[in-house]
């Protein structure tokens, strides 16, 4: 019974994890953070063209081997009528929140972000302090 559970664990957890790690190791990654692409992924429209309030939550895989397991996430806010987005993210445990450290929809360590959640209009305005 124990051997079957161990085999089941290996098949259902370790095999997919190893496969993903192998795939990830073959991806073209920057050697270090200085060489990574941090530019905008052009996922957001120009802030001036959006008249309503918006809140976006983005996530992108982190750099090097940690990208197998982890994502970096951040929140982008734009008040109604604002001419620019404001990005909030935390880099490192226990560090303060960074404001506009990177492009609102910028890549993270060369990895394109994905939109996790979006709130627009009056609902977004109610959530923005």
Role assignments for model-derived ranges:
Residues 4-23:
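Hydrophobic membrane-insertion alpha-helices, especially the h-region
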């Amino acid at each position: 019974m124990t051997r079957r559970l161990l085999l089941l664990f290996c098949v259902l957890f370790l095999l997919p994890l190893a496969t993903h790690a192998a795939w990830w190791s073959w991806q073209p990654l920057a050697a270090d953070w200085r060489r990574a692409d941090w530019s905008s992924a052009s996922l957001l429209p120009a802030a001036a063209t959006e008249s309503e309030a918006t809140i976006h939550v983005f996530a992108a895989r982190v750099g090097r081997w940690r990208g197998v397991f982890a994502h970096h996430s951040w929140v982008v806010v734009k008040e109604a009528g604002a001419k620019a987005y404001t990005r909030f993210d935390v880099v490192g445990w226990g560090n303060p929140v960074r404001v506009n450290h990177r492009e609102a929809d910028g890549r993270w360590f060369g990895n394109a972000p994905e939109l996790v959640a979006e709130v627009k209009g009056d609902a977004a305005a109610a959530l923005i302090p």
